Amino acid sequence: MEWKYMRIQGREDSWVTKYPKGIFGMCWRMIMDGKMEPEDEKLFREVVDWFIANLPQPEPCRNGEKVITFFKTGTAGEMLPMIEPAVRLMDKYNHPYDIVYTNFIGTVIYEDEWQAAVRVENGKMI
């Protein structure tokens, strides 16, 4: 079976989207709550820096719109090893998450070679 999209998400909802937080949001929350050790925060910031340098940031995300993003599985090969340290931090701090593979993500409002963004309303993709 082939999947078009993949998302790493938590089991707690974002206060903005009312949809499960993505991996970046979960890590930032742990940092803001003082739950992450300084060397782990440094590691996470290196992950973020790599993504900023290598992927476009979707305009709807920059604008704070109610959207969630998915990696495209067909081009995620280079990104997955780069996101892995953040996933290991979830494991280290015993923070629950799910890796979701799907072909159905709702109406795409932003798309590039590596990712797609969809609008979320009342905790549901539209």
Predicted segments, located by residue:
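A residue-level detector for conformationally permissive "hinge/kink" positions
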Residues: 2, 26, 86, 105-106
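Long, contiguous N-terminal structural blocks used for assembly/anchoring
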Residues: 1-76
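Residue-level detector of alpha-helical secondary structure
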Residues: 45-48, 52, 80, 84-87, ...
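Acidic, proline/glycine-rich low-complexity IDRs
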Residues: 88-126
